[in-house]
């Protein structure tokens, strides 16, 4: 079901889709609502399974500017992966046309965390952005998305992104504890990464080491 109508200066829309309780991954009911006015867009998405459990309930405000766009998330207590999280009230992520990112976003639930935080410049390093992900259960994430394969494992990431004069850099660690893909165990993955891209990312320097179950499996330098 889909509907679009006008209320004052706003264009309002709603989209609903349902399926039987035999649907892939148990997806049963998905509702998308929102409105558009000028350069502002509001989107709300809610998903339930066959047992009427809410797997996802979250909204996004999007503002389009001449040389950037800004997104913020609501409410302060969204549901993600069947759990009720807390989002900082002043959350905001702005992406500029040169891909500079200004962010203040922190989503937390028990020992789980998704954080994007802009940091002050440090020497030649400017536009610093800390990306921190802790304790994310991939199984719950893939259960609410029909587009992802069946995965399980606990994701953690600690990355620093920055600009050093005309070089884009990234350094840190990405790991998954006890990763399973389509019910087949792949192991515990641990990737240490350093990357530098110059000349609009056409010139690359990469240094990474991949370990699986604490055994070094791949090393790339160059």
Where are these regions (language model features)?
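Interface amphipathic segments
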Residues: 1-222
């Amino acid at each position: 079901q889909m509907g679009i109508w006008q209320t004052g200066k706003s264009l309002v829309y709603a989209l609903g889709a349902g399926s039987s309780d035999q649907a892939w991954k148990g997806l049963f009911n998905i509702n998308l609502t929102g409105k558009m006015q000028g350069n502002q867009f509001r989107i709300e998405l809610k998903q339930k399974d066959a047992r009427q459990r809410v797997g996802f309930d979250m909204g996004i405000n999007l503002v389009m500017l001449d040389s950037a766009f800004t997104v913020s998330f609501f409410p302060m207590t969204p549901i993600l992966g069947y759990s009720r999280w807390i989002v900082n009230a002043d959350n905001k992520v702005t992406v500029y046309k040169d891909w500079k990112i200004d962010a203040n976003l922190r989503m937390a639930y028990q020992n789980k965390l998704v954080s994007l935080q802009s940091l002050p410049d440090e020497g030649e390093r400017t536009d610093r952005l800390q990306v921190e992900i802790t304790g994310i259960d991939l199984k719950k994430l893939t259960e609410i998305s029909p587009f992802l394969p069946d995965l399980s494992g606990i994701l953690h990431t600690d990355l620093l992104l920055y600009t050093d004069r005309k070089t884009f850099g990234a350094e840190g660690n990405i790991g998954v504890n006890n990763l399973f893909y389509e019910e087949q165990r792949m192991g515990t993955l641990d990737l240490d990464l350093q990357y530098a891209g110059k000349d609009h990312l056409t010139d690359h320097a990469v240094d990474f080491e991949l370990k699986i179950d604490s055994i070094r499996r791949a090393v790339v330098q160059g």
